[in-house]
Amino acid sequence: MGKLIRMGTQERRLLRPKRLHWSRLLFFLGMLIIGSTYQHLRRPQNPPSMWTKVSSQQPIKLAIRDLPNDEITVTDKDPPEASSEVEGEMLAPQDTVIIGEAAPSIAMEDTPNPPITTKITPTSLKNNYSPTTAGTRRQKENIPPTPSRAPSHFISTSGRQRVKSYTPKPRGGRKSSSPTHTREEGRMHTPSPAGAPRTISPTSTEKDSETTATYRMLEPRSERTAGKTSLKRMVPNTRTFLTREVETDLVTSPSLVGKNTLGSPRRGERNSSTTPLRAVLQPTPATSEEQVTASIRMGSTPATTEGSTAAQRIGNPLSGTSTPAVRIASVTDREKRPSTAHGTLVTPQVKAVLTTQVHRCVVVKPAPAVPMTPSPSMTAILFPEAPTSGPSALPPGWPNLHPKAEYPPDLFSVEDRRQGWVVLHIFGMTYVFVALAIVCDEYFVPALGVITDKLQISEDVAGATFMAAGGSAPELFTSLIGVFISHSNVGIGTIVGSAVFNILFVIGTCALFSREILNLTWWPLFRDVSFYILDLSMLIVFFLDSLIAWWESLLLLLAYALYVFTMKWNKQIERWVKEQLSRRPVAKVMALGDLSKPSDGAIEENEQQDNKKLKLPSVLTRGSSSASLHNSIIRSTIYHLMLHSLDPLGEARPSKDKQESLNQEARVLPQTKAESSSDEEEPAELPAVTVTPAPAPEDKGDQEEDPGCQEDVDEAEHRGDMTGEEGERETEAEGKKDEEGETEAERKEDGQEEETETKGKEKQEGETESEGKDEQEGETEAEGKEADHEGETEAEGKEVEHEGETEAEGTEDEQEGETEAEGKEVEQEGETEAEGKEVEHEVETEAERKETNHEGETEAEGKEADHEGETEAEGNVEHQGETEAEGKVEHEGETEAGEKDEHEGQSETQADDTEVKDGEGEAEANAEDQCETAQGEKGADGGGGSDGGDSEEEEDEEDEEEEEEEEEEEEEEESEEPLSLEWPESRQKQAIYLFLLPIVFPLWLTIPDVRRQEARKFFVITFLGSIIWIAMFSYLMVWWAHQVGETIGISEEIMGLTILAAGTSIPDLITSVIVARKGLGDMAVSSSVGSNIFDITVGLPVPWLLFSLINALQPIPVSSNGLFCAIVLLFLMLLFVIFSIASCKWRMNKILGFTMFLLYFVFLVISVMLEDRIISCPVSV
């Protein structure tokens, strides 16, 4: 981009547009040349025939089954060709057998390589195929590889070869030439439809290669051998083509199954129930022999004699199936199955006892796509008993419409990959995970942030929409690829797996790795989980029929719109809900409030810490919208984490002691608030907070107890986000407002009131900021700090509070201070009175020690960390924390005043809490008194100008604050600094830099970085470019995952549930853990659930709806062996998490985290077993 030159405290950028312009142009040209060359080189290697042939062959249908058994009745004249595919010999026509031997010569005429021809008694299969189709039926399918091939497949080894590569018409001629043919013709002709099959309107399917069968009644076994040989030859040939086709067609069209069965009809039967494709591929010549020799006893007496011989051969009860026995997957399945379940069907179909040895059915239908459409109906007809496969049959059927996923050919064959080259695919898949995270964090999310600014969308709505889309983009594109390219359920598997990963693994990991027990706010969790349960329930209902209609997709999208609308009115809804809850009897509310209160002894400390921690996250995340973790300011990007922080978790930990861990809470809180309230950030980030914390679930006790104070404050806080000063001033500082205004005026006019001014001003700043920021930031800082200081410095905190009060207030405040501080205040007030202003500075120094460490850091971080990322913020925080702590005591004077305000708020809340515990009536009265005293104290602080001896220092503090603000703004700019390609210093970071360069450099060349002011106007290009890159990376991820699964033998659904789900969620996992270690459990939990809502209500229905619109509103099949059960499991896991957290009093301890961690792996094991049919889903549809 240019060089960065440090000038003073500012950075100026030297841009070289010309060089940049040419470098980008050359890069594009190079990419075009490389891409075109690659395509040119790859074209010759890709045989289009594979896919096209398969598709053309798939249409092949079994015509024979349609023929009525009557038609199939075999007379000696009847040639097996009636079942166009196979000539079957009837046992009765043993004479024919002799003819059959002579027939080979005839067959020879037709086909130089005659396979043994057997009469197809089942030629007229009773299967419901149309008679014409019956004639063509399975033999055609058997030929799938090439119609011409079928004749070649026929093996002359069987001495009686009637290789009838019949075109439907030639077949008739051949039949006439051989006596066996005559018989078949007689049979076929007997039923006029049978004759039709010979002609085989579907004959085209049969024509290329007809089943040649020797009907040896006397020599069934020898025929078997011949059949075996031919079938074996046939099988290898067909396997190549049939493997994919058969599987796909199995569900869709039995004909494909037939092809597979040719290899092994028995396996074909098994496979047809499960996966016909494999069965077809699996067929062994031995099985084919058995299938080939099929004795069908229809009912003709002569057949009975030969029935025994036929029985020896294979005894395929399916008359129709026996004819095409080898090739027709459906038929073959039935043939073998007939012995089990389908046998009955077969037996009725064959009226005449025929021994049909199908040495090979090489009839390939160059069938039009027509069979594909009818295939579902055909399947139903062919497999009336097959429905045992259940919904799984349907889903395979659809993918079968696209037998092969539309991926480019791999440089390595499956054998090569199994020898170890699959490691490259695994590495590529992992690398793409990192690439997706970088694109989303560095370009897509910032572009979304600019869009929300341009559209002036509120942060809650933006978080629920744009920011959630930024974090879930990989899952959305994986779903699109699964529907339109891979034709599998990989997208559903990825989203369901990602949802479970987010709920169990991410939250469990946060609980395990956080340095303290995570306290959660009930409202955001309750809100998001309620929507999530609603959406999951809808999804389960829609999955019941294994089809998703267009209106079902639309309903899911509308559910998302409802969620966005709720986020828009989140504050009002939350306030209304809490008001409803606050109207309950006090005992109930206190029960809620007491959830986090351990015992009376530690109540003040712990309750306030808990309440504040509980409240802060919700304020911090502005209603805990799902955007919280995807916010570009809070979120440390993967690139920054890898280059600037090799130990992000370690850096998150300033020290091991709890107070400092609480500090970090306080840090992040202001960070996020600074983001939301950047407009309201005034002179400095004063932690001063005069607002008593809004009632979190635990605060409700307080809320009720001082309705006059806290409810107003609650409203004030909600309004504070929007109105800034008004909210607090209305409730607590109305008097203070006037006096503060006066004190500011006085401060300019009078030198005496300068200290009051600081206090007044701090309270103004403290309040204005603390009201604008405060309620968004100051509160969080103050509360975070309160929480920080409450642990160690409650006494000091109260000293600070009350010293601040008493100093500013004079004797008035002593009394009020006594009322509030009760015991401690009086002592500390005595000190403060005696010490006067010195105490302030002592307090300042105390505050400085703790606050500068905390506040200095928090302020530094407040703006820095927001933008720089948590890790950088922490790095810089040290410097600024130190510099501010050392050099800016005055600033801490303000922070102290801020602290005093904070601590006034604390003392109020603490007093409230203690009073609450003491008695409800007292609590209410005291709360009101405290509200009044707080206002009075603040007024006294603002108006008691006698304390103003430190005016100069305070002015200096203000100047320093302004300077600090400028520095912080600069730091913010730095933290928002665009992607930098500067060479790092350490060897380790240099290695990481080189590792990431192949990802970062193309992105840097092709996408404008909207974090640069000059590129901000190109946000649309950045948005679209990011989407293109995310789509490309997602495609590579799914493709390589498919290759890995194919090599190892894992389906795409399982890959999606496990590896892809974890890979796309790892960036969120890293960020969630970092945030949780800072004490913000709410953000981690709410963001995890919120992103899941986006996945289920947008990631899934959008591809489905597009598919339906493109395909004339047809429903899309979605069922999978275990996917439905996985969704039900996800629902149960969600309920478990919620009940567990609620039973633990909204705290997440390490035992709960470890349990969730284990449950995730249990879910994975169960899901994989369901997909592989190792266990069956008890909740099957």
From Swiss-Prot:
Modified residues (Phosphoserine): 625
Segments traversing the membrane: 420-440, 465-485, 492-512, 520-544, 553-569, 990-1010, 1018-1038, 1054-1074, 1093-1113, 1122-1142, 1151-1171
Keywords per UniProt: Antiport, Calcium, Calcium transport, Cell membrane, Glycoprotein, Ion transport, Membrane, Phosphoprotein, Repeat, Sensory transduction, Signal, Symport, Transmembrane, Transmembrane helix, Transport, Vision
Compositionally skewed regions (Basic and acidic residues) per UniProt: 730-750, 757-775, 782-805, 834-906
Residue segments, region Disordered: 107-232, 255-276, 300-323, 598-617, 650-983
Sequence ranges of the Sequence repeats: 730-741, 742-754, 755-766, 767-778, 779-791, 792-804, 805-817, 818-830, 831-843, 844-856, 857-869, 870-881, 882-893, 894-905
Skewed-composition ranges (Polar residues): 124-136, 301-311
Annotated Pfam families: Na_Ca_ex
One GO biological process term: calcium ion transmembrane transport
Cytoplasmic compartment spans: 441-464, 513-519, 570-989, 1039-1053, 1114-1121, 1172-1181
Membrane topology: Multi-pass membrane protein
Biased composition (Acidic residues): 701-715, 806-820, 921-931, 949-979
Glycosylation sites: 271
Protein name (record): Sodium/potassium/calcium exchanger 1
Organism: Rattus norvegicus
Gene that this polypeptide is encoded by: Slc24a1
